[in-house]
Amino acid sequence: MKIEKASHISQPVQLSTCTLIDTYPGHQGSMNNKEVELYGGAITTVVPPGFIDASTLREVPDTQEVYVNSRRDEEEFEDGLATNESIIVDLLETVDKSDLKEAWQFHVEDLTELNGTTKWEALQEDTVQQGTKFTGLVMEVANKWGKPDLAQTVVIGVALIRLTQFDTDVVISINVPLTKEEASQASNKELPARCHAVYQLLQEMVRKFHVVDTSLFA
């Protein structure tokens, strides 16, 4: 499989600080997440119930695995998620950054540029495993279809898993488009509880990420 190299786009811009909160009653965390096979079974991790493989709906790049939320409003999963989140796993060539946090920022910059903005704020950052695994939660104002008048506040959980033996950076991103009410809450320096649920999901996806077949990187 051809692994594409991410390109350096922009520098992070510090915005106002928000507080990450968890107020979702009955949140059960990872209890209901299910194991999935990625890239033809070469990699495994977990995704929540109610998320479907986007390749069954549309074409997805070879380096990516995409899962979209297909839940309905009347369904109850008790995991803190809503109905509009999406998950992307991307295999990229390792960027020339020895510091893992700097490499993570590099990939975040690419993601935000794809969303039509260069301004983003890191809400939370964690080293999961020294030198190889880093996670964070960022917030941006994305321009839909490049139109500022359609701007939407988006929170993104971003994980970097560095597979040094394969010269590969695995980037997992979970997108959370905020409603107007949630965006208003965020502007008051608080985030909706589902952002915390997304971050817990991201960290579990990283913990349970396993390479099963190394020929994927041959």
Swiss-Prot record:
Which InterPro entries does the UniProt entry name for this protein?
Mog1, Mog1/PsbP_a/b/a-sand
One short Pfam family name for this protein?
Answer: Mog1
Print the keywords alphabetically. mRNA transport, Nucleus, Protein transport, Transport
Q: What is its main location?
A: nucleus
Kindly list the GO molecular function terms attached to this UniProt entry.
guanyl-nucleotide exchange factor activity; small GTPase binding
- SUPFAM superfamilies per UniProt: Mog1p/PsbP-like
One record GO biological process = mRNA transport
Localization: Nucleus
Domain of life assignment: Eukaryota
Provide GO CC annotations from the record: nucleus
Q: How does it assemble?
A: Interacts with GSP1.
Instruction: Describe the task this protein carries out.
Output: Involved in the Ran-GTPase system for nuclear protein import and poly(A)+ mRNA export.
Q: What else is known?
A: Present with 2840 molecules/cell in log phase SD medium.
- Family the UniProt entry places it in: Belongs to the MOG1 family.
Q: What is this protein called?
A: Nuclear import protein MOG1
Organism this protein belongs to:
Saccharomyces cerevisiae (strain ATCC 204508 / S288c) (Baker's yeast)
Task: Cite the source lineage.
Answer: Eukaryota, Fungi, Dikarya, Ascomycota, Saccharomycotina
